[in-house]
Curated annotation (Swiss-Prot):
Monomer. It comes from Arabidopsis thaliana (Mouse-ear cress). This is (R)-mandelonitrile lyase-like. It comes from the Eukaryota. The lineage of its organism: Eukaryota, Viridiplantae, Streptophyta, Embryophyta, Tracheophyta. Its EC number is 4.1.2.10. Glycosylated. It holds the Pfam family GMC_oxred_C. It catalyses: (R)-mandelonitrile = benzaldehyde + hydrogen cyanide. The keyword Glycoprotein applies.
Length: 552
């Protein structure tokens, strides 16, 4: 009976809010997104020859692949293969307000976001569009933390790192304009002691800061695909709707000691026709297909544990026991509330970085509300009711818990199977408990008072959507249970082909000539509060490094 009354009150309240104009939606029409000038070297894979030769073949036009291709094209002939389409003709992808729609409007064929569910049952997504996940994410931009560079397994030229970040930032990074919810979160973080206030900065710093955004002031998205503007158009070709089936490998005894070499790739176009792209002398195949796609392609190309590949009937080119191992995903936990005040769509702009390994972020969205109740007094509205929902979330540093990726099929279009083993390491659980406790402090701050509803006799409370924080937040066991029950993803999964196990310090696949991985599959830790800045930097950084290698 109580639940029925509460649902009825919620529905009535929403109708009243609508009549008062508190619940609202943006009436702005999507901007007309004119194709950028570099579209002239982007073509459907159906337009490509059945066989052609290139200096570099990059598989995956995503967050790292686009800047890598643009850089290498300055001196060499480059082919960039993307399994999805272009983002510029998709208003929801290109719009700040289309973020949630892009993540939920998915199919098995060509949607910009491809959904998958981990074996734990946590829904997730991967990019399937030029620009990769940088074209479907929340747009937050922040550089990596010091710990990432120290523990990555790579020897970094920090001067080149900074120059590569700046190269990205000049093109696609903007200072966000804080409005109601993000301003309140900034004030709340400072009130509960997440100090100091670092203002607007792209650097990773302990305290509270305003980060960069890949959405401009008009709400238009700028993804890594925009970095193709830097490409030398006479040296680059980009094929969209090009699904790479496998890397072509050949036996080739060499001075390096490896007797297997990559010589090209096989890809399929939308009509089902196969194409062969082959590399010239001293060329390379580079996998930039992401933490799911790159390990999957290694398996399908015959690189992986011998006994495992044999069970799938895949001919073994290289017995590599660690492909698909050391997979990680940063768990996200938090709460959502329906505020009693007008609210805008805002994605992550402010972050609180705590000393004990928690990153605190927030977002607000105006979403359609569908009531399960029917009333003879209220006719179905011509348009849906829209409800503001605000969220406070925390992501943990690391993580330490290790997962596993394996094939679900020999069809590359089918997502691999992945288990992230969230909170299997006690250190991750401890960090989550600390982070969710800090969310509790934020909710009790003065800055959050305006987001509580007023009840009879002067009482005030939050109207939660989904699970609220436990009442007894001092109890470690209760808080740990909350972390496990409410775990979700922040889409920062990585690993599966990590440095020192599958690739060396130059990101070359150990035991294979002319094959390199440049993407998040090589990471053993997520960089900073959001990995996209570092992945784009990595594409530029490795491109410059490879150009220097060829000049020797």
């Amino acid at each position: 009976m109580t639940k029925r009354i509460d649902s009825s009150l919620l529905y009535t309240a929403l109708v009243v809010l609508l009549l008062l104009g508190v619940v609202h939606r943006s009436n702005a029409r999507p901007r007309v997104n004119r194709p950028p000038g570099f579209m002239r070297f982007i073509s459907n894979a159906t337009d490509f020859a059945s066989e052609d030769y290139y200096d570099y073949i990059i598989v995956g036009g995503g967050t790292a692949g686009c800047p890598l291709a643009a850089t290498l094209s300055q001196s060499f002939r480059v082919l960039l293969l993307e399994r999805g389409g272009v983002p510029y003709n998709r208003p929801n992808v290109m719009s700040h307000d289309g973020f949630l729609t892009t993540l939920t409007d998915v199919n098995n064929f060509d949607s910009p976001a491809q959904s998958f569910i981990s074996e734990e049952g946590v829904p997730n997504a991967r990019g399937r569009v030029l620009g990769g996940s940088s074209a479907i994410n929340a747009g937050f931009y922040s550089r990596a933390d010091k710990q990432f560079f120290e523990n990555s397994g790579l020897v970094w030229d920090l001067s080149s790192v900074n120059q590569s970040y700046e190269w990205v930032e000049r093109a696609i990074v903007f200072r966000p304009q804080l409005r109601t919810w993000q301003t309140a979160i900034r004030d709340a973080l400072l009130e509960v002691g997440v100090h100091p206030f670092n203002g607007f900065t792209l650097e990773h710093k302990v305290g509270t800061k305003i980060g960069g955004s890949t959405f401009d002031r008009t709400g238009r998205r700028h993804s890594s695909a925009d970095l193709l503007r830097y490409a030398r158009s006479s040296n680059i070709r980009v094929a969209v709707y090009a699904t790479v089936e496998r890397v072509l490998l050949a036996s080739s005894p060499s001075v390096s000691g490896s007797n297997v070499s990559a010589i090209g790739v096989v890809y399929r176009d939308q009509l089902g026709r196969f194409h062969h792209a082959l590399i010239r002398d001293r060329g390379e195949v580079i996998l930039s297909a992401g933490a799911l796609g790159s390990p999957q392609l290694l398996f399908l190309s015959g690189i992986g544990p011998r006994s495992y590949l044999s069970t799938w009937g895949i001919p073994v080119a290289l017995d590599q026991p660690h492909v698909g191992d050391f997979v990680y995903d940063n768990p996200r936990n938090g709460i959502s509330i329906v505020p009693p005040v007008p609210m805008e769509n805002s994605l992550i702009q402010v972050v609180g970085v705590t000393e004990d390994g928690a990153f605190l972020e927030a977002a607000s969205n105006v979403i359609p509300f569908a009531s399960p109740l029917h009333s003879v007094f209220i006719r179905a509205p011509a348009s849906p009711l829209y409800v503001p929902v605000t969220t406070i979330m925390e992501k943990i540093l690391g993580p330490v818990s290790i997962g596993l990726l394996r094939l679900a099929s020999t069809d590359v279009r089918i997502n691999p199977v992945v288990r992230f083993n969230y909170f299997s390491d006690p250190q991750d659980l401890e960090r989550c408990v600390n982070g969710t406790r800090k969310i509790g402090e934020i909710l009790r701050s003065r800055a959050m008072q305006d987001f509580m509803i007023r009840e009879w006799f002067g009482n005030r409370r939050f109207r939660f959507v989904g699970a609220p924080l436990p009442v007894d937040q001092s109890n470690d066991l209760v808080m740990a249970d909350f972390c496990r029950r409410t775990v979700s993803t922040i889409w920062h999964y990585h690993g599966g082909a990590v440095v020192g196990k599958v690739v060396d310090s130059d990101l070359k696949v150990i035991g294979v000539n002319s094959l390199r991985l440049v993407d998040g599959s090589t990471f053993n830790i997520s960089p900073g509060t959001n990995p996209q800045a570092t992945l784009m930097m990595l594409g530029r950084y490795m491109g410059l490094k490879m150009l220097r290698e060829r000049m020797r």
